[in-house]
């Protein structure tokens, strides 16, 4: 109904273009309605600088276990260590939210099962895994902005946890984007909204969904 009302012919989706376009949920929808669908992420995640890390006043070598939920925070952690000339001890343990994130550690360290644990991607699974290692001194690697649920829960459990921001979500380069070309822009997060409204005046924006 909304398509007929607005005479929609072109949509922008704020996501990376799927590797297999036919598997996109928009593919059949676009074909059935004779729509053009473009894909462009409006945000990106970048590691913090060494200066930003040091401002958080956390000593990596005072901790025994890293908690990771993304590849970007892993990259940032090891980049910070390299830049600060910190040698990560072989005794360091790692807890990851998924197996895919855990396997990414192989880029930097020898993968040993006794050192690396991973959850199934759910909050409760990750929490149980952390509690199982309750005597460790943790660094919780975060991407800003982040949901406070996990750091607050770990604090209530009185675990030795240092929440540290290793990455930030920032606006992508939108200089080549003309939002007036589109009838609808599909956004997926508050960060998408922020990036779009900071880059363009509201009167230049089409319908946002």
Predicted regions and their residues:
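Conserved beta-alpha
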Residues: 2-209
């Amino acid at each position: 109904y909304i398509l007929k009302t607005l005479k929609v012919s072109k949509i922008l989706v704020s996501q990376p273009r799927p590797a297999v376009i036919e598997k996109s949920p928009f593919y059949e929808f676009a074909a059935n309605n004779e729509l053009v669908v473009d894909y462009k992420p409006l945000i990106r995640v970048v590691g913090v600088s060494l200066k930003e890390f040091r401002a958080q006043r956390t000593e990596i070598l005072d901790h025994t276990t890293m908690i990771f939920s993304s590849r970007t925070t892993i990259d940032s952690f090891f980049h910070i260590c390299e830049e600060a000339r910190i040698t990560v001890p072989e005794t360091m343990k790692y807890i990851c939210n998924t197996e895919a994130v855990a396997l990414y550690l192989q880029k930097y360290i020898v993968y040993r099962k006794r050192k690396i644990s991973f959850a199934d991607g759910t909050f409760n699974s990750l929490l149980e895994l952390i509690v199982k290692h309750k005597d460790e001194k943790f660094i919780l690697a975060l991407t800003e902005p982040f949901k406070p649920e996990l750091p607050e829960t770990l604090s209530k459990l009185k675990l030795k946890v240092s929440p540290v921001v290793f990455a930030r979500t920032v606006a992508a380069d939108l200089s080549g984007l003309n939002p007036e070309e589109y009838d609808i822009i599909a956004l997926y997060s508050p960060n998408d909204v922020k990036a779009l409204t900071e880059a363009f005046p509201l009167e230049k924006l089409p319908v946002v969904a």
